[in-house]
Amino acid sequence: MRHELERLEQADYKEKLQGKAKPQMIFFTAEWSEPCRQMQGLVEELADAHYAQADFYQVDLDEQPLIAGDFNIAGVPALVICREGKEEERIVGLRAYPDLEKVVVKYL
């Protein structure tokens, strides 16, 4: 079953990330980026495999530039791993699924 990534919006994203026991995986993307399109499916696979242990979100760089600014996103694709809305680690650039999963499982 495919678990869609919940889209974060400026109005309420901080509330969504606070007070959660599970780690949050935030995928920063842009429609115009081919590497982002390629990595989208990989992040969705991660969400399918680990939805019970982590919350998965998506932020479009062009639609939500303030959120991207809050996380100092300079390039996409980027996967930011947070706890309670605070960054623990980030992966920047297109990566293979095993490389992504290796980092993600450290926080589950």
Indicate residue ranges for each PLM-predicted region.
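A short glycine-leucine-enriched loop at secondary-structure breakpoints
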Residues: 70-74
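Conserved redox-active cysteine motifs that mediate thiol-disulfide chemistry
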Residues: 28-42
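Conserved helix-turn-beta segment immediately C-terminal to the redox Cys motif
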Residues: 21-23, 40-59
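N-terminal leader/targeting and pre-domain segments
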Residues: 1-24
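Structural microenvironment flanking redox-active thiols in thiol-disulfide oxidoreductases
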Residues: 61-67
